[in-house]
Amino acid sequence: MVISFMTRAELLLWPAANNWGEARRSALNQHMGLYLTLYPDERTCTIWAAIVDRCRRAGHPIQAADAWIASTARQWGCPLVTADFGDFAAVEDLEIVPIR
């Protein structure tokens, strides 16, 4: 499975933001080793800009971090698995797999 660089960055923030102990930090790092992290290139940046612009014009602005996640998924043709369906609902041509 793959994750966006932005998802990886958000996951790396959790331990500091939530005062995790060393055991939880270690478990997260081990778990993240199961995923390939996809990093942006010029095409990702172009897709990101289009997503941000289209969402803004449609009256549904998207957070920059969410646009990075969506642009990575769209570029690689990956479904976006998320518990935050609403954050991505206005993004066109994106397969969203909601989790609960």
What are these regions (language model features)?
Residues 83:
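Conserved acidic donor-binding loop of glycosyltransferase catalytic domains
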Residues 1-75, 79, 89-91, 95-100:
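PIN-domain endoribonuclease scaffold, especially VapC-family toxins
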Residues 86:
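Flexible glycine-rich beta->alpha loop in the catalytic core of nucleotide-sugar glycosyltransferases
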